[in-house]
Amino acid sequence: MVLEYQQREGKGSSSKSMPPDSSSTTIHTCSEAQTGEDKGLLDPHLSVLELLSKTGHSPSPMGQNLVTSIDISGNHNVNDSISGSWQAIQPLDLGASFIPERCSSQTTNGSILSSSDTSEEEQELLQAPAADIINIIKQGQEGANVVSPSHPFKQLQKIISLPLPGKEKTPFNEQDDDGDEDEAFEEDSVTITKSLTSSTNSFVMPKLSLTQKNPVFRLLILGRTGSSFYQSIPKEYQSLFELPKYHDSATFPQYTGIVIIFQELREMVSLLNRIVQYSPGKPVIPICQPGQVIQVKNVLKSFLRNKLVKLLFPPVVVTNKRDLKKMFQRLQDLSLEYGEDVNEEDNDDEAIHTKSRSYCRNKKAENSKKKSPKSNKKPKRKKQKFFTSWFTWGISITIGISFGCCVTYFVTAAYEHQTVKSLSLRPSILASLLSLDSSSDTINTPATASPSSTEQFLWFDKGTLQINFHSDGFIMKSLTIIKETWGKMNTFVLHALSKPLKFLENLNKSSEFSIDESNRILALGYILL
């Protein structure tokens, strides 16, 4: 351990007032006669454990005023036994205990060496990064860790501040008030740098200072209507927000995020410029008026693109109670996570921004999960409609085919038992099919001449209509009827389209369309349906 302190000239006689118990320790004092020698350097072979294990004396009042502050990242517990052992080290033992060979009346620097490489450790301490030193200054008198960049894990250095007595005070004089203590702390102080290497038996000192508070999740409300908005917040969420006590923009870095409430876009831009000036990269939550969401998003795009601010929550309309409730619930969850992870994560705005982005991703995943049951139900409904439509179409097609088959069979049976006036010899079915002409209604046979179309067929003759279900040539008769029907329908459609106004007249005047033929076409039309 290395002790660096500065002693006043009038403290040379402080060794006279040493307590009698100090003689039992392993630290020897020098006599007043040895004024020309070095004084302030202790035995280099003493270790920290030997100083902590010395017994037989009670801590002096000056030793009780010892102020120690060790900042060890990730360890926030206080060990009273170790802190008591440190308080047992008396300032007079540190200031008035010398080695006879190295005593001097002049102001010198003393050191307690725990190893032989203290010069390298001091050099590494002096070569510490400037950012670590600035961090120590900002934290005030409580100290901070100074870790060398070359040996981040092999060496642990801590800074402890010890108060020394005033000019006119004896070692056992009690201080009257706290003001004298502060003056003595500011004027006379000893900086002890303890270096623990991996080669020695070392222990880790826990944090002894109870003045430093853990970071708290707090959001600052900015804007002219901030007070009214704060009053409208439910009481269970008001602890997360805070109004500015002093109109000082320098307090922005102390808060986790900033809530911006405004009525005009110019006010929003001015508030964002203040935040960027005093605390760049701070997470913000804009609360706008109805109808300003799109304009607010356009303004935020430029700030977010340049990484001037970060968005902790999307813009919320002040009159939308539902979105405000979602925002309050989300911030409460963030505060709980922030309090749990404060010992493991750094207190910076980037971690908060990461949480906000993870929250957006989780929210999208939850929305997709909520939508998935609906998406599963929709195909079922489609399948039901699909089966229903197919069932309906199947029934209709079946009925249509059955009806058509019945009508076709009825017509073919009537065709077989028709009465022929002009035809003496009935031709065979195959000869009739081959000699059938689609343009005429005659059946040419080698034995007979072709009669007129009006005298060849007599359909639906009541006297001669006999249906024979066991007749031969059902397929050939069906093909003949279909072919004849197709030719008749073509002629009928052409005439109907060419002369729509004289449709009935054409039916009566035309020799090809008799009443019987029209009835036959009407009957065959049901087959097509």
Curated annotation (Swiss-Prot):
* Extent of Low complexity compositional bias: 12-24
Give the Basic and acidic residues compositional bias ranges.
1-11
Q: What is its main location?
A: mitochondrion
Q: How is it modified after translation?
A: Phosphorylation of Ser-114 and Ser-119 are critically important for mitophagy and for the ATG11-ATG32 interaction. Phosphorylation depends on both HOG1 and PBS2.
Q: Where Phosphoserine occurs along the chain?
A: 114, 119
* A GO cellular component entry from the record: mitochondrial outer membrane
Stretches of Basic residues bias are at 370-381
Q: What is this protein called?
A: Autophagy-related protein 32
Q: Which organism is it from?
A: Saccharomyces cerevisiae (strain RM11-1a)
Provide the taxonomic classification.
Eukaryota, Fungi, Dikarya, Ascomycota, Saccharomycotina
